[in-house]
Amino acid sequence: MDWEGVTFGAFLGVAGTFGMLALAFYPVMRRTFLLWNAVRTFAFCLMGLALFPVELPAFFPTGEARIDIGEIALSIAVGCTGPFLAAYIEERAPYARIRFWLRTMLPIGVLGGVATALAPWWPRLDWLHDLIILAMILGLLVALIVA
């Protein structure tokens, strides 16, 4: 056992616990941010499994496919952050535009995942994925500052 393994296990444990708690509380609270939180944490866990250099079962892809799975999961996780935060923002008129833009981040994140999946055939799409991630992070930052 080394510190990398301990840190990775702690990350998966904390992220998995948050995701499972969000799903457990959803039937009681009926708030959509709980579902978005569960999807986000699942995507972050998948990203961690795919990108961390740990031995995985034989059915899990290896090599470039494993890296692509991690990058697709990252795109989905960052894309789910927009609707997750939009569920928190009040539905008053001044914040309607911010909520709209936060909700559009999921399709943009899916587009980044598709760009990653197609990158083996069109290598320039890797750059598109990186630019999409950067744009989503900047959009989240601006939305948080304005809200």
Set out the residue ranges of the language-model regions.
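Individual alpha-helical transmembrane segments in multi-pass integral membrane proteins
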Residues: 1-113, 123-134
